[in-house]
């Protein structure tokens, strides 16, 4: 089954078009086969149903993978999901789409949850130690599609932009959609983006935040201030 599901994901990536606006990124809809996606989503429910998420203005997270320190999920659907993401064919087709030549040396992924009212600290390009960033949206039917990752002009400093007024595009927050990009942070060019939940329609925004990392790193010990670890 792993091989069949891997081929499906590979084809979904291959058949999705890269966008250059406002900077290079790749949106892949229906990223996983339905059975695998449904299983993965079900295995996150012990965290998405946490009592702390009944409050507004909360950001919570649960770490599923940090490859170099041997952190992996114990459940079958999530295991298969991450085996697919770590498969060299999958990694190589993503790199090809995003024009990346460097190889990753580590891999990290967490479940990331925002309740209504939460706005990320600031518009940011992502740290330069990240080779590839992937956001995988776990939206429910009827959720607010505007809750996807917001994208901003690459030639401006994020601290000088408004999270809502200066957004030029947002990835669609729809079930099983993915946004992929290669972080860049130079004086002239920044992959500026941000996340927030100011929706009147959707109380809980759910996604995986996944990173292929340039060097080995233990991110399980990072103290993420202002965020609840589940």
Task: List the model feature ranges, each with a label.
Residues 4-8, 13-97:
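Non-heme Fe(II)/2-oxoglutarate
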Residues 113, 123-129, 140-141, 145-230:
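Catalytic core of Fe(II)/2-oxoglutarate
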Residues 115-118:
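Tight coil/turn sites that cap or link beta-strands
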Residues 78-81, 100, 120-123:
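Short helix-to-loop capping/linker segments positioned immediately adjacent to catalytic or ligand/cofactor-binding
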Residues 37-40, 120-123, 193:
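A short acidic (Asp/Glu
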Residues 99-110:
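A short coil-to-beta-strand element that immediately follows conserved catalytic motifs
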């Amino acid at each position: 089954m792993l091989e069949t599901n891997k081929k499906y994901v590979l084809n979904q990536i291959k058949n999705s078009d890269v966008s250059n606006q406002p900077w290079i990124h790749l949106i892949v809809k229906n990223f996983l086969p339905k059975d695998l996606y449904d299983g993965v989503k079900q295995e996150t429910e012990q965290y998405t149903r946490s009592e702390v998420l009944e409050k507004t203005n909360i950001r919570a997270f649960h770490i599923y993978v940090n490859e170099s320190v041997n952190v992996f999920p114990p459940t079958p659907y999530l295991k298969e999901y991450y085996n697919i993401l770590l498969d060299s064919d999958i990694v190589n087709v993503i790199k090809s789409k995003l024009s990346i030549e460097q190889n990753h040396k580590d891999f990290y992924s967490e479940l990331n949850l925002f309740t209504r009212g939460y706005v990320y600290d600031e518009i940011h390009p992502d740290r330069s130690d990240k080779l590839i960033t992937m956001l995988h949206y776990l939206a429910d039917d009827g959720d607010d599609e505007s809750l996807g990752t917001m994208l901003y002009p690459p030639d401006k400093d994020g601290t000088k932009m408004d999270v809502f007024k200066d957004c030029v595009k947002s990835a669609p927050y729809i079930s099983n959609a993915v946004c992929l990009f290669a972080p860049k942070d130079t004086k002239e060019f920044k992959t500026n983006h941000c996340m927030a939940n100011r929706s009147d329609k959707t109380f809980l925004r759910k996604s995986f935040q996944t990173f292929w990392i340039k060097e080995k790193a233990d991110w399980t010990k990072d103290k993420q201030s202002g965020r609840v670890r589940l």
